[in-house]
């Protein structure tokens, strides 16, 4: 696992430990949003063929184009999830 992914997963775990609503975490990386581990499967299911779910050696992730954020956030929320977006240097 590369250090960026490890930092994001760490941040995700810490954030979820502090927030009882356990939001789906979306991390911006250039032109894509990524989500990891337990968040990847529901996001992939909600987005269907538009979302990519992949299994790396030691983590699972889903990704989608940043251009689709305004379309996908409501779809995720309609399924009953909360969403937190990390779009900056701390991520």
Question: At which residue positions do the language-model features occur?
Answer:
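Basic, polar low-complexity surface loops/patches
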Residues: 1-91
């Amino acid at each position: 696992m590369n250090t960026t992914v490890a930092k994001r997963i760490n941040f995700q775990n810490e954030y979820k430990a502090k927030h009882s609503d356990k939001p789906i975490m979306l991390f911006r990386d250039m032109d894509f949003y990524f989500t990891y581990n337990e968040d990847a499967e529901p996001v992939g299911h909600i987005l269907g063929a538009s979302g990519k779910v992949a299994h790396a050696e030691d983590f699972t992730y889903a990704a989608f184009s940043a251009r689709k954020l305004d379309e996908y956030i409501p779809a995720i929320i309609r399924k009953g999830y909360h969403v937190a977006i990390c779009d900056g240097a701390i991520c």
